[in-house]
A protein has these predicted regions:
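Cytosolic covalent-transfer regions centered on His/Cys nucleophiles
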Residues: 1-108, 117-173
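Short beta-strand scaffold segments in enzyme catalytic cores
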Residues: 113-115
Length: 173
């Protein structure tokens, strides 16, 4: 007999941050601050300690890019006139500290981010608050990592020239 399907409802909070730079400059700055992950260096590291050391160098601000999608180009020719680039941003050494407790956390790791130009021509960063996603697993060890990711996200927002929200105040309880 199979187990019943589990459904988990949780609160999500989307954060929309105004960035001071024009779209192309903001995107370039983001990609400078969140470099592309070097998976080859990680897979050939030889030990987990060596992976941790490699990632420390690769992710000076805590995050690396695992994917970039140019939304603007894939909707070219449509009525949509937005400029937008989506990213998967994270750190697999941080994610592993949750994965060891529940592999399904990887549905939220890496984090999804979007840089876009709004109708008024202002550049925005959109991202969901990590701690709320990871708190939904009901495991304090996982929730604690979500809080750490909130702090890294706040730092990244500040480095991008945005105003980081007070994420601790936004957590339930």
């Amino acid at each position: 007999m199979t187990e019943p399907t589990t459904v988990v409802d949780y609160v999500a909070r989307r954060i929309l941050v105004a960035l001071p730079d024009a779209y192309d400059e903001a995107r370039a700055r983001y990609e400078q601050l969140v470099p592309i992950v070097d998976l080859e260096a990680c897979s050939s590291a030889g030990s987990w300690a060596a992976v941790l050391a490699a990632v420390e160098v690769q992710a000076p601000n805590g995050f690396m890019r695992y994917y970039r999608g140019d939304v603007t180009s894939v909707v070219a020719g449509s009525p949509s006139r937005w400029k937008a680039t989506q990213y998967l941003m994270g750190n697999h050494t941080i994610a592993e500290t949750m994965f060891r407790h529940d592999p399904s956390v990887m549905v939220y790791a890496p984090l999804r981010t979007l840089i876009y130009e709004d109708p008024a021509g202002r550049t925005r960063l959109a991202v969901d608050q990590p701690s709320l996603q990871f708190a939904s697993f009901g495991d304090p060890r996982i929730a604690e990592v979500g809080v750490r990711l909130d702090a890294l996200l706040s730092r990244l927002i500040a480095l991008l020239g945005g105003e980081p929200p007070e994420l601790a105040a936004l957590r339930p309880g």
